Structure formats: structure tokens, C-alpha cells
């Protein structure tokens, strides 16, 4: 059996040993998975050779199903973002070759950072032992095994990862996502019913939307401005840009993407949820062949007391992106020198479809550069935030640098433009961004204020450079800058 990549599609050629030729057969199922059309290979029954299986050989029930339960079915289930379900033996058996291949080559589960394991919390990758179990199971004919609890061998866990939330906030009414092919960006306002301030240590989003959500972010708005925009729109939610009054909690980023594993903030790092606040839930939605109802839920887990630690978000970015059509290696650089010492708690890189490579380094005053994050095959569909198990300590004077590489050529299979077009900085997926958010923890209040003042100057500089670049591109477009 052979697999071929043809453009954005994976095709299957099935070899018939009796005819000693390639059958003229190709089965493709086009699925709109997170904005990119891919082909799902449909393996037919009976192509796998029957083998005598040793009694101690790996089986589906005893060995493979637990791996699928833990790592795969969060996406590969009915209504999930995965293009097929893996909830039962027959579904796994018919795709045993594909499962073995993509796990052996670490294509699935998708995990983009390069480096040794156990650097980040909740890493979404298989161990070598798990990969070997799947490979051996396939090699031995993908036996089912026996168990009295076979029907429950794989469980699509629709429950909350951290148990029942202290509070569940739901959209007041579902949004009807019309059938189509163009991505939809929409904000939804969810009033939060708390009678007194609470401290939040964890947030989980349950999409409940049949694979329609590409990713989501949550911001807090106490001004009522987002609520007014929602009321002015006849449909649930509203379009356009995020209101300036809606912000992440200071030092935190609240987001969700398929396959995300939820972890609690470390002790003392909870954030304040005030009364009379609205959640502004921003959704990147993927229409399908039929209308879908979108109505996710937000689960909140409260801490017993107020936060004792106050993180600060350090942002590296470029608003001057201007990528010529056909350029296969457009490089974006930004750097920032820390005025105070910090512990680096988490890192969140962001780019769109033209992004290909990312490297983030830290060079302290002694000159010994260390890599904080490296991604060699960036995929907009699998963006994530990465929380360190052991936060690196970066002394004052450390230079943090980001280097992002973009491919705007026709050879980039994720290029949204055919033929390639000029792409500039902007919020749409067909625009580009280069952003890096670092969740940092200064030693104390004085250091926190010094860091925030320094970052305000950097943010102002970034915006000025962005406006200057926009004026150079189109001097007559004053409306977008007023």
C-alpha cells in the first residue's frame, strides 16, 4: 500500500498481489478541517493480511484502545474536528495502517514544538512505547482481543477535564452557522452571573458545536460596549473587530483550540473575575455542507482566595509585515531586552497560513543563548500555548528574540492565495501576523511596574512602526487609520 501527497490531498493506491498491479482506485473524502481541505483515506475491509497472532501480542482492547482514549478521541469522534471517528474497533482496524504510519512519523497527535519531551505541561505527543505498541498491533494484523468491557474500551469523554466546574457560562442562544466555505469570525457576549468578585484558577471551553470551531479566545468587558454591539446585530453576536474595552485578564491569555488539555494555574496565579462583567467569546468558525448550531459552554474553576502572584504579558510582534508574492523565505524579527529578572511561565506564538518556522531564543548578559521554543513546521490549524513544567529564569538584561519565517510561494500547500498575492499585516486569516506572547513573573511589585512601563513604550513603538508601514503602502487610505 502506498501513500502519495498530491498538493493538499493524500491519496491511496491499493496494491492487489493477485493481479500484480496497482488497482485504478482512489478514495478521497474532502473534509474542511480547520480551514484547510485535506483528504481522508478510506481504507477498505480486507486489505490487511490475516496473521496468526501470538497470545502475548498487542490487541486493540488491551493495548491500543487506552492510547486512543487518552490521545485521539478528543478530536476523532462524531462531531469532533477529526475527519473520522475512532470510537470502536472496526473504525480503528480499517485505518490501522494509517494510524501506524502517522503515529510512527509523529504527524499525529499534532505536536509542533521541537525538542525533548516533558518540557511543557500537557504535551500532546505519544511516547516511544505507545508508538511501538500501535506499530506492533498493526504488524500483527490489528487483532481485537477480548474483554467483558469491550464496548467501553474507547470512551469519548464529553465531560469536563477537571471535573464539574464551579460555574458554567453558556451563550444565551445558539448561533446558526450557515453552510458555506468561507471562514467566519464572530464575537459573542456572555454575561457572567457572579454576585461578588471571584478568583479563577482554570477555564475550559466545551465547543458543543460539531467540529465547527477552529479556535476561540475569551476576553473580559466591564464597559457594556460589546453588549451594545451584540444588541445592534439581529443575529446572536456581532462581527467586526474586538472592542478595545474587552481585554484578557492582566498577565493571562484565555483560549481554546481542538485537542487542548486544560491545566490549573500554579498556586497564587488565579485572576480576578469582577461583578457586572461580560465574557466576549471570539470564535473562528468553519462552515460545513449543512447549517450548524454553535453554542459552546465556558467552565470556570474558582480558587479559595485572591491571587498572590501577578504575571505580566511580554509581547514581541511586527506590524510591518509586507510579504511579496512568490517569496519563499520572508523573515520577521523582533527582540526585547528585559529590564528586570523574570520567570518565564508560558509562551504563545501566533502566525497565520504563510508561517512556516519559528524560533524564540533568550541571550542573558553572559552571552549563553538558549532556545525557548522552536517550531519547524508551523501549522495555523494547531496553534497552542505552551506552559513550562520548570519555568526558565531569565536575569535582567536578557535579550529575547523571535525569528519567524514565512513562505508566500506557490509551493506552500497552506497558502490561501492561488496564485500568491501580496500579504500584509492584518487580523484576517488571509492576512499575516507575527506575534509572541510570554507570560512572565517578576520578583515583586517594583519589578512588575518597571517591566510594565518598559512594555508600554515598546507597544507604542510597535504601533507607530505599523502605522508608518501602512502609510507607505497606501498614503491615501486615511480612513483605516483614524
Residue ranges and their predicted role:
Residues 51-195, 206, 276-282, 287-289:
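Aromatic- and Gly/Pro-enriched helix-to-coil junctions and flexible linker segments
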Residues 346-424:
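Extended, compositionally biased non-globular segments
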